[in-house]
Amino acid sequence: MGSKSPEDHRQGPDGGSADAAVTIINPPKSAAASGLLQGMLEGQDEDGDDDDDEKTGINVKTYDGAKKKRKRNKKKSKKVAVIQQTFPPRIPLATLFDNQPYPEGQIVDHVVKDDNIKRTTTEELRHVAALNDMDDDFLKDYRKAAEVHRQVRHHAQTIAKPGVSMTRLAEEIDEGVRALTGHTGLETGDALKAGLAFPTGLCLNHVGAHWTPNAGAKEVILKHDDVLKVDFGVHVNGRIVDSAFTVAANPVYDNLLAAVKAATNTGLGEAGIDARIDHISEAIQEVMESYEVELNGKTIPVKAVRNITGHNILRYRIHGDKQVPFVKTKTDQRMEEGDIFAIETFGSTGKAHLRDDVGVYGYGRNENMSPAVLHQSSAKSLLKTIDANFGTLVFARRQLERLPGVEKYHLGMRTLVNSGLVESYAPLVDITGSYIAQFEHTVLLRPNCKEIISRGDDY
Protein backbone atom coordinates (compact mmCIF):
# COMPACT_ATOMS: atom_id res chain seq x y z
CA MET A 1 0.00 0.00 0.00
CA GLY A 2 1.69 3.20 -1.20
CA SER A 3 2.47 6.17 1.01
CA LYS A 4 2.01 9.64 -0.45
CA SER A 5 5.02 11.95 -0.27
CA PRO A 6 4.81 14.41 2.65
CA GLU A 7 5.03 17.50 0.45
CA ASP A 8 1.85 16.51 -1.38
CA HIS A 9 -0.30 15.05 1.33
CA ARG A 10 -0.49 14.99 5.10
CA GLN A 11 0.66 11.58 6.25
CA GLY A 12 -1.99 9.48 7.91
CA PRO A 13 -2.38 5.84 8.83
CA ASP A 14 -3.03 5.12 5.16
CA GLY A 15 -1.70 7.29 3.46
CA GLY A 16 23.08 0.61 -0.21
CA SER A 17 25.34 0.45 -3.25
CA ALA A 18 23.98 -0.48 -6.64
CA ASP A 19 26.42 -3.33 -7.19
CA ALA A 20 26.06 -4.92 -3.77
CA ALA A 21 25.92 -8.69 -3.94
CA VAL A 22 22.89 -10.50 -2.58
CA THR A 23 23.26 -14.11 -1.46
CA ILE A 24 20.10 -16.20 -1.30
CA ILE A 25 20.39 -18.56 1.65
CA ASN A 26 16.95 -20.11 1.48
CA PRO A 27 14.81 -19.92 -1.69
CA PRO A 28 11.10 -19.15 -1.35
CA LYS A 29 8.50 -21.85 -1.21
CA SER A 30 5.19 -21.79 -3.03
CA ALA A 31 1.99 -21.95 -1.09
CA ALA A 32 1.40 -25.45 -2.43
CA ALA A 33 4.78 -26.69 -1.27
CA SER A 34 4.72 -24.99 2.10
CA GLY A 35 1.59 -26.23 3.78
CA LEU A 36 -1.20 -27.11 1.37
CA LEU A 37 -0.55 -30.85 1.88
CA GLN A 38 0.08 -32.27 5.30
CA GLY A 39 -0.14 -35.82 6.62
CA MET A 40 0.84 -37.95 9.56
CA LEU A 41 1.80 -41.57 9.99
CA GLU A 42 0.80 -42.78 13.42
CA GLY A 43 2.97 -45.36 15.18
CA GLN A 44 4.74 -46.48 12.00
CA ASP A 45 8.35 -46.90 10.99
CA GLU A 46 9.40 -46.04 7.46
CA ASP A 47 8.63 -49.57 6.27
CA GLY A 48 5.27 -49.60 8.04
CA ASP A 49 6.28 -52.43 10.43
CA ASP A 50 6.18 -52.48 14.21
CA ASP A 51 9.57 -53.20 15.72
CA ASP A 52 8.18 -56.04 17.82
CA ASP A 53 7.08 -58.00 14.74
CA GLU A 54 10.67 -58.56 13.74
CA LYS A 55 11.62 -59.78 17.22
CA THR A 56 8.66 -62.04 18.06
CA GLY A 57 7.74 -65.45 16.61
CA ILE A 58 5.64 -68.52 17.59
CA ASN A 59 7.43 -71.84 18.30
CA VAL A 60 5.80 -74.78 16.45
CA LYS A 61 6.88 -78.45 16.68
CA THR A 62 7.43 -80.28 13.37
CA TYR A 63 6.73 -83.96 12.66
CA ASP A 64 10.29 -84.87 13.64
CA GLY A 65 10.12 -82.99 16.91
CA ALA A 66 12.24 -80.04 15.72
CA LYS A 67 11.09 -76.61 16.55
CA LYS A 68 10.23 -74.22 13.76
CA LYS A 69 9.50 -70.51 14.00
CA ARG A 70 6.40 -69.21 12.28
CA LYS A 71 6.62 -65.50 11.57
CA ARG A 72 3.66 -63.29 12.24
CA ASN A 73 2.14 -61.46 9.31
CA LYS A 74 3.32 -57.88 8.97
CA LYS A 75 0.77 -55.21 9.77
CA LYS A 76 -0.54 -53.28 6.82
CA SER A 77 0.53 -49.64 6.63
CA LYS A 78 -2.11 -47.15 7.59
CA LYS A 79 -3.24 -44.70 4.92
CA VAL A 80 -1.87 -41.17 5.11
CA ALA A 81 -4.41 -38.64 6.33
CA VAL A 82 -4.27 -35.74 3.89
CA ILE A 83 -5.47 -32.22 4.59
CA GLN A 84 -5.63 -30.17 1.44
CA GLN A 85 -6.55 -26.51 0.98
CA THR A 86 -9.88 -25.91 -0.69
CA PHE A 87 -10.53 -23.79 -3.75
CA PRO A 88 -11.31 -21.02 -3.00
CA PRO A 89 -9.08 -21.21 0.11
CA ARG A 90 -11.25 -21.39 3.23
CA ILE A 91 -9.48 -23.80 5.64
CA PRO A 92 -7.80 -21.81 8.46
CA LEU A 93 -4.01 -22.08 8.50
CA ALA A 94 -4.12 -23.22 12.12
CA THR A 95 -5.97 -26.36 10.93
CA LEU A 96 -3.85 -26.80 7.82
CA PHE A 97 -0.48 -26.64 9.60
CA ASP A 98 -1.56 -28.34 12.88
CA ASN A 99 1.10 -26.71 15.09
CA GLN A 100 3.80 -27.07 12.43
CA PRO A 101 5.96 -23.98 11.72
CA TYR A 102 4.84 -21.62 8.98
CA PRO A 103 7.15 -21.27 5.93
CA GLU A 104 10.02 -18.82 5.97
CA GLY A 105 10.22 -15.98 3.52
CA GLN A 106 13.29 -15.51 1.33
CA ILE A 107 16.35 -15.31 3.61
CA VAL A 108 19.10 -12.99 2.34
CA ASP A 109 22.45 -12.10 3.93
CA HIS A 110 22.92 -8.49 4.97
CA VAL A 111 25.39 -6.53 2.85
CA VAL A 112 28.10 -5.09 5.07
CA LYS A 113 28.22 -1.29 4.81
CA ASP A 114 31.44 0.60 5.45
CA ASP A 115 29.89 4.07 5.48
CA ASN A 116 28.03 3.83 8.78
CA ILE A 117 27.39 6.96 10.82
CA LYS A 118 26.68 7.35 14.51
CA ARG A 119 23.01 7.03 15.41
CA THR A 120 21.34 9.85 17.26
CA THR A 121 19.57 9.32 20.56
CA THR A 122 16.17 9.29 18.85
CA GLU A 123 17.33 6.63 16.42
CA GLU A 124 18.69 4.53 19.28
CA LEU A 125 15.35 4.67 21.09
CA ARG A 126 13.48 3.72 17.93
CA HIS A 127 15.95 0.89 17.36
CA VAL A 128 15.44 -0.50 20.87
CA ALA A 129 11.65 -0.29 20.49
CA ALA A 130 11.79 -2.20 17.20
CA LEU A 131 13.92 -4.97 18.70
CA ASN A 132 11.66 -5.23 21.75
CA ASP A 133 8.74 -5.90 19.41
CA MET A 134 10.58 -8.93 18.01
CA ASP A 135 9.37 -11.28 20.76
CA ASP A 136 8.87 -15.05 20.52
CA ASP A 137 5.66 -14.66 18.50
CA PHE A 138 7.07 -12.11 16.06
CA LEU A 139 8.25 -14.50 13.32
CA LYS A 140 5.37 -16.91 13.88
CA ASP A 141 2.82 -14.13 13.39
CA TYR A 142 4.63 -12.67 10.38
CA ARG A 143 5.09 -16.01 8.65
CA LYS A 144 1.46 -16.91 9.21
CA ALA A 145 0.31 -13.58 7.75
CA ALA A 146 2.64 -14.08 4.77
CA GLU A 147 1.38 -17.60 4.09
CA VAL A 148 -2.21 -16.36 4.22
CA HIS A 149 -1.26 -13.68 1.67
CA ARG A 150 0.38 -16.23 -0.65
CA GLN A 151 -2.58 -18.61 -0.61
CA VAL A 152 -5.21 -15.89 -1.02
CA ARG A 153 -3.37 -14.14 -3.84
CA HIS A 154 -2.88 -17.47 -5.64
CA HIS A 155 -6.66 -17.81 -5.72
CA ALA A 156 -7.07 -14.15 -6.73
CA GLN A 157 -4.67 -14.61 -9.64
CA THR A 158 -6.74 -17.50 -10.99
CA ILE A 159 -9.96 -15.47 -11.08
CA ALA A 160 -8.54 -12.05 -12.05
CA LYS A 161 -9.45 -12.58 -15.70
CA PRO A 162 -11.39 -10.42 -18.17
CA GLY A 163 -15.07 -10.51 -17.22
CA VAL A 164 -14.66 -10.63 -13.44
CA SER A 165 -16.21 -7.79 -11.44
CA MET A 166 -14.14 -5.82 -8.97
CA THR A 167 -16.75 -6.48 -6.29
CA ARG A 168 -16.42 -10.23 -6.65
CA LEU A 169 -12.63 -10.08 -6.68
CA ALA A 170 -12.54 -7.89 -3.56
CA GLU A 171 -15.00 -10.16 -1.74
CA GLU A 172 -13.00 -13.28 -2.65
CA ILE A 173 -9.82 -11.71 -1.25
CA ASP A 174 -11.52 -10.35 1.88
CA GLU A 175 -13.28 -13.62 2.69
CA GLY A 176 -10.14 -15.63 1.95
CA VAL A 177 -8.12 -13.59 4.45
CA ARG A 178 -10.80 -13.92 7.12
CA ALA A 179 -11.18 -17.66 6.58
CA LEU A 180 -7.46 -18.46 6.61
CA THR A 181 -6.67 -16.31 9.64
CA GLY A 182 -9.66 -17.82 11.44
CA HIS A 183 -11.15 -14.43 12.34
CA THR A 184 -14.39 -13.28 10.75
CA GLY A 185 -14.18 -9.82 12.31
CA LEU A 186 -17.86 -9.80 13.29
CA GLU A 187 -17.37 -9.90 17.06
CA THR A 188 -16.14 -6.74 18.76
CA GLY A 189 -12.35 -6.60 18.58
CA ASP A 190 -12.00 -9.77 16.48
CA ALA A 191 -10.62 -7.90 13.45
CA LEU A 192 -7.80 -6.59 15.66
CA LYS A 193 -6.60 -10.14 16.38
CA ALA A 194 -6.04 -11.02 12.72
CA GLY A 195 -7.48 -10.23 9.30
CA LEU A 196 -7.31 -7.45 6.73
CA ALA A 197 -4.63 -4.84 7.39
CA PHE A 198 -6.22 -2.26 5.06
CA PRO A 199 -8.90 -2.21 2.33
CA THR A 200 -8.19 -4.43 -0.67
CA GLY A 201 -6.96 -2.16 -3.47
CA LEU A 202 -8.05 -2.97 -7.03
CA CYS A 203 -6.78 -0.20 -9.29
CA LEU A 204 -7.24 -0.15 -13.06
CA ASN A 205 -5.08 1.55 -15.68
CA HIS A 206 -4.41 5.22 -14.75
CA VAL A 207 -5.67 4.71 -11.18
CA GLY A 208 -2.44 4.21 -9.26
CA ALA A 209 -3.55 3.39 -5.72
CA HIS A 210 -6.31 3.55 -3.11
CA TRP A 211 -9.38 2.39 -5.02
CA THR A 212 -11.74 -0.30 -3.76
CA PRO A 213 -15.34 -1.18 -4.70
CA ASN A 214 -18.09 -0.03 -2.35
CA ALA A 215 -21.82 -0.66 -2.25
CA GLY A 216 -23.91 1.72 -4.34
CA ALA A 217 -21.17 2.54 -6.84
CA LYS A 218 -21.26 1.53 -10.50
CA GLU A 219 -19.90 -1.97 -11.02
CA VAL A 220 -16.51 -2.19 -12.73
CA ILE A 221 -15.69 -5.20 -14.93
CA LEU A 222 -12.13 -6.22 -15.84
CA LYS A 223 -11.45 -6.00 -19.60
CA HIS A 224 -8.80 -7.55 -21.85
CA ASP A 225 -6.93 -4.25 -22.30
CA ASP A 226 -6.92 -3.32 -18.61
CA VAL A 227 -3.91 -3.21 -16.30
CA LEU A 228 -5.03 -4.29 -12.82
CA LYS A 229 -3.06 -3.69 -9.62
CA VAL A 230 -4.02 -5.90 -6.66
CA ASP A 231 -2.77 -4.57 -3.32
CA PHE A 232 -3.94 -6.10 -0.04
CA GLY A 233 -2.55 -6.60 3.45
CA VAL A 234 -2.84 -9.32 6.08
CA HIS A 235 -2.11 -8.88 9.77
CA VAL A 236 -1.77 -11.30 12.67
CA ASN A 237 -1.71 -9.57 16.06
CA GLY A 238 -0.90 -6.29 14.31
CA ARG A 239 2.09 -7.69 12.38
CA ILE A 240 1.31 -6.49 8.86
CA VAL A 241 2.32 -8.10 5.56
CA ASP A 242 1.82 -5.64 2.68
CA SER A 243 2.29 -7.06 -0.82
CA ALA A 244 0.97 -6.21 -4.29
CA PHE A 245 1.12 -7.44 -7.87
CA THR A 246 -0.14 -6.44 -11.33
CA VAL A 247 -1.97 -8.53 -13.93
CA ALA A 248 -2.63 -7.71 -17.59
CA ALA A 249 -4.24 -10.05 -20.13
CA ASN A 250 -2.85 -8.13 -23.11
CA PRO A 251 0.88 -8.91 -23.65
CA VAL A 252 1.45 -5.38 -24.96
CA TYR A 253 1.94 -4.35 -21.31
CA ASP A 254 4.56 -7.03 -20.56
CA ASN A 255 7.44 -4.54 -20.59
CA LEU A 256 5.62 -2.22 -18.19
CA LEU A 257 5.11 -5.06 -15.72
CA ALA A 258 8.69 -6.27 -16.20
CA ALA A 259 10.07 -2.78 -15.50
CA VAL A 260 8.21 -2.41 -12.23
CA LYS A 261 8.94 -5.94 -11.05
CA ALA A 262 12.66 -5.45 -11.78
CA ALA A 263 12.65 -2.11 -9.96
CA THR A 264 11.00 -3.64 -6.89
CA ASN A 265 13.51 -6.50 -6.84
CA THR A 266 16.30 -3.94 -7.11
CA GLY A 267 14.94 -2.15 -4.05
CA LEU A 268 14.72 -5.43 -2.16
CA GLY A 269 18.29 -6.26 -3.12
CA GLU A 270 19.59 -2.89 -1.93
CA ALA A 271 17.60 -2.94 1.34
CA GLY A 272 19.42 -3.87 4.53
CA ILE A 273 20.73 -2.69 7.87
CA ASP A 274 22.41 0.74 7.50
CA ALA A 275 21.42 0.98 3.82
CA ARG A 276 21.05 4.60 2.71
CA ILE A 277 17.54 5.29 1.45
CA ASP A 278 18.74 7.81 -1.14
CA HIS A 279 20.98 5.12 -2.68
CA ILE A 280 18.07 2.67 -2.82
CA SER A 281 15.82 5.26 -4.49
CA GLU A 282 18.41 6.10 -7.12
CA ALA A 283 18.96 2.43 -7.95
CA ILE A 284 15.21 1.82 -8.29
CA GLN A 285 14.75 4.74 -10.69
CA GLU A 286 17.72 3.72 -12.82
CA VAL A 287 16.30 0.22 -13.37
CA MET A 288 12.69 1.32 -13.83
CA GLU A 289 13.42 3.99 -16.41
CA SER A 290 15.64 1.75 -18.52
CA TYR A 291 12.46 0.16 -19.94
CA GLU A 292 10.16 1.28 -22.76
CA VAL A 293 6.66 0.22 -23.82
CA GLU A 294 5.24 0.08 -27.36
CA LEU A 295 1.64 1.35 -27.29
CA ASN A 296 -0.43 2.22 -30.37
CA GLY A 297 2.68 2.40 -32.53
CA LYS A 298 4.48 4.77 -30.15
CA THR A 299 7.48 4.02 -27.96
CA ILE A 300 6.77 5.32 -24.46
CA PRO A 301 9.34 5.38 -21.64
CA VAL A 302 8.36 3.87 -18.31
CA LYS A 303 8.57 6.56 -15.63
CA ALA A 304 8.94 6.07 -11.89
CA VAL A 305 6.01 7.69 -10.05
CA ARG A 306 7.37 10.69 -8.14
CA ASN A 307 4.92 11.42 -5.32
CA ILE A 308 4.11 8.03 -3.81
CA THR A 309 6.63 5.93 -1.89
CA GLY A 310 7.47 2.70 -0.16
CA HIS A 311 7.44 2.92 3.63
CA ASN A 312 8.29 1.25 6.89
CA ILE A 313 5.57 -0.61 8.77
CA LEU A 314 4.80 -0.39 12.48
CA ARG A 315 2.61 -2.65 14.57
CA TYR A 316 -1.03 -1.97 13.67
CA ARG A 317 0.16 0.95 11.49
CA ILE A 318 0.65 0.45 7.77
CA HIS A 319 2.72 3.65 7.40
CA GLY A 320 5.61 4.52 9.70
CA ASP A 321 7.86 7.58 9.59
CA LYS A 322 10.33 6.40 6.93
CA GLN A 323 9.71 6.56 3.19
CA VAL A 324 11.47 4.95 0.23
CA PRO A 325 10.87 7.03 -2.94
CA PHE A 326 11.22 5.54 -6.42
CA VAL A 327 13.19 8.53 -7.73
CA LYS A 328 16.55 10.03 -6.78
CA THR A 329 16.15 12.00 -3.58
CA LYS A 330 18.19 13.75 -0.89
CA THR A 331 17.84 12.27 2.59
CA ASP A 332 20.14 11.09 5.34
CA GLN A 333 17.73 8.39 6.50
CA ARG A 334 18.98 4.84 6.73
CA MET A 335 17.38 1.49 7.28
CA GLU A 336 17.99 0.05 10.74
CA GLU A 337 18.07 -3.32 12.45
CA GLY A 338 14.53 -4.27 13.44
CA ASP A 339 12.88 -2.17 10.71
CA ILE A 340 10.07 -3.64 8.61
CA PHE A 341 9.69 -2.14 5.14
CA ALA A 342 7.14 -2.36 2.37
CA ILE A 343 9.38 -2.09 -0.69
CA GLU A 344 7.09 -1.18 -3.57
CA THR A 345 7.42 0.62 -6.88
CA PHE A 346 4.97 2.16 -9.33
CA GLY A 347 5.80 2.72 -13.00
CA SER A 348 3.64 4.85 -15.31
CA THR A 349 3.28 5.63 -19.01
CA GLY A 350 1.73 9.00 -18.08
CA LYS A 351 3.02 12.00 -16.13
CA ALA A 352 4.07 9.78 -13.20
CA HIS A 353 2.55 12.26 -10.75
CA LEU A 354 -0.59 11.15 -8.90
CA ARG A 355 -3.41 13.41 -7.72
CA ASP A 356 -6.51 12.83 -5.59
CA ASP A 357 -9.61 11.72 -7.47
CA VAL A 358 -13.27 11.77 -6.39
CA GLY A 359 -14.59 9.13 -4.03
CA VAL A 360 -13.40 7.53 -0.80
CA TYR A 361 -11.09 4.53 -0.58
CA GLY A 362 -11.08 4.17 3.18
CA TYR A 363 -10.91 5.76 6.61
CA GLY A 364 -8.29 5.82 9.33
CA ARG A 365 -8.23 6.99 12.93
CA ASN A 366 -6.15 10.08 13.71
CA GLU A 367 -4.54 9.32 17.05
CA ASN A 368 -3.34 12.87 17.54
CA MET A 369 -6.88 14.25 17.90
CA SER A 370 -8.82 14.04 21.16
CA PRO A 371 -12.49 12.92 21.10
CA ALA A 372 -13.26 15.70 23.58
CA VAL A 373 -14.16 17.92 20.61
CA LEU A 374 -17.19 15.71 19.83
CA HIS A 375 -20.68 16.68 20.93
CA GLN A 376 -22.86 14.69 18.52
CA SER A 377 -24.00 11.38 20.05
CA SER A 378 -24.02 9.50 16.73
CA ALA A 379 -20.42 10.55 16.05
CA LYS A 380 -19.34 9.50 19.55
CA SER A 381 -20.96 6.09 19.12
CA LEU A 382 -19.38 5.58 15.70
CA LEU A 383 -15.93 6.55 16.99
CA LYS A 384 -16.29 4.01 19.78
CA THR A 385 -17.12 1.32 17.20
CA ILE A 386 -14.12 2.30 15.06
CA ASP A 387 -11.72 2.22 18.01
CA ALA A 388 -13.01 -1.16 19.21
CA ASN A 389 -12.92 -2.89 15.83
CA PHE A 390 -10.18 -1.23 13.76
CA GLY A 391 -7.98 0.80 16.10
CA THR A 392 -5.32 2.39 13.87
CA LEU A 393 -5.97 0.03 10.93
CA VAL A 394 -7.42 1.65 7.80
CA PHE A 395 -10.84 0.28 6.80
CA ALA A 396 -13.33 0.58 3.94
CA ARG A 397 -17.06 1.26 4.07
CA ARG A 398 -17.90 -2.37 3.33
CA GLN A 399 -15.83 -3.49 6.34
CA LEU A 400 -17.71 -1.09 8.60
CA GLU A 401 -21.14 -1.90 7.18
CA ARG A 402 -20.84 -5.64 7.87
CA LEU A 403 -20.50 -5.06 11.62
CA PRO A 404 -23.65 -5.83 13.65
CA GLY A 405 -25.62 -2.72 14.58
CA VAL A 406 -23.85 -0.33 12.21
CA GLU A 407 -26.39 1.56 10.10
CA LYS A 408 -27.12 5.15 9.11
CA TYR A 409 -23.59 6.12 10.04
CA HIS A 410 -22.91 8.63 7.24
CA LEU A 411 -23.71 11.77 9.25
CA GLY A 412 -21.56 10.59 12.14
CA MET A 413 -18.69 9.76 9.77
CA ARG A 414 -18.91 13.17 8.16
CA THR A 415 -18.64 14.74 11.60
CA LEU A 416 -15.61 12.61 12.49
CA VAL A 417 -13.84 13.52 9.24
CA ASN A 418 -14.64 17.24 9.54
CA SER A 419 -13.37 17.29 13.13
CA GLY A 420 -10.09 15.61 12.13
CA LEU A 421 -10.64 12.56 14.34
CA VAL A 422 -10.87 10.33 11.26
CA GLU A 423 -9.07 10.83 7.95
CA SER A 424 -10.57 9.82 4.62
CA TYR A 425 -8.41 8.68 1.71
CA ALA A 426 -9.20 9.34 -1.93
CA PRO A 427 -8.11 7.29 -4.97
CA LEU A 428 -4.83 8.43 -6.53
CA VAL A 429 -4.74 8.81 -10.32
CA ASP A 430 -2.44 9.77 -13.20
CA ILE A 431 -3.72 11.28 -16.48
CA THR A 432 -6.55 9.44 -18.23
CA GLY A 433 -5.26 7.07 -20.90
CA SER A 434 -2.07 6.21 -19.04
CA TYR A 435 -1.21 2.86 -17.48
CA ILE A 436 0.41 2.15 -14.12
CA ALA A 437 1.88 -1.08 -12.74
CA GLN A 438 2.86 -1.94 -9.16
CA PHE A 439 4.79 -4.69 -7.36
CA GLU A 440 5.49 -4.82 -3.63
CA HIS A 441 6.96 -7.04 -0.91
CA THR A 442 7.43 -6.80 2.85
CA VAL A 443 10.97 -7.29 4.17
CA LEU A 444 12.06 -7.83 7.78
CA LEU A 445 15.51 -6.51 8.72
CA ARG A 446 16.41 -9.16 11.28
CA PRO A 447 19.69 -8.91 13.24
CA ASN A 448 21.47 -11.62 11.22
CA CYS A 449 19.70 -11.41 7.85
CA LYS A 450 16.84 -9.84 5.95
CA GLU A 451 13.74 -11.91 5.27
CA ILE A 452 11.54 -11.03 2.30
CA ILE A 453 8.60 -12.43 4.19
CA SER A 454 5.96 -12.19 1.43
CA ARG A 455 8.10 -13.70 -1.34
CA GLY A 456 6.45 -16.53 -3.29
CA ASP A 457 6.92 -18.51 -6.49
CA ASP A 458 4.66 -16.04 -8.32
CA TYR A 459 6.72 -12.87 -7.75
Swiss-Prot record:
Function in brief: Cotranslationally removes the N-terminal methionine from nascent proteins. The N-terminal methionine is often cleaved when the second residue in the primary sequence is small and uncharged (Met-Ala-, Cys, Gly, Pro, Ser, Thr, or Val).
Annotated binding of a divalent metal cation 2, by residue: D242, H311, E344, E440
Q: Where is the composition biased (Acidic residues)?
A: 43-54
Pfam families assigned to the protein according to its UniProt record, in alphabetical order: Peptidase_M24 (PF00557)
Write down how the cofactor binds this protein: Binds 2 divalent metal cations per subunit. Has a high-affinity and a low affinity metal-binding site. The true nature of the physiological cofactor is under debate. The enzyme is active with cobalt, zinc, manganese or divalent iron ions. Most likely, methionine aminopeptidases function as mononuclear Fe(2+)-metalloproteases under physiological conditions, and the catalytically relevant metal-binding site has been assigned to the histidine-containing high-affinity site.
Task: Name the residues that bind substrate.
Answer: H210, H319
Q: What is this protein called?
A: Methionine aminopeptidase 2-1
Q: Which organism is it from?
A: Pyrenophora tritici-repentis (strain Pt-1C-BFP)
The annotated region (Disordered) lies at 1-79
Q: Where is the composition biased (Basic and acidic residues)?
A: 1-12
Report the cofactors.
Co(2+); Zn(2+); Mn(2+); Fe(2+)
Q: Show the GO cellular component annotation of the record.
A: cytoplasm
GO MF entries: initiator methionyl aminopeptidase activity; metal ion binding; metalloaminopeptidase activity
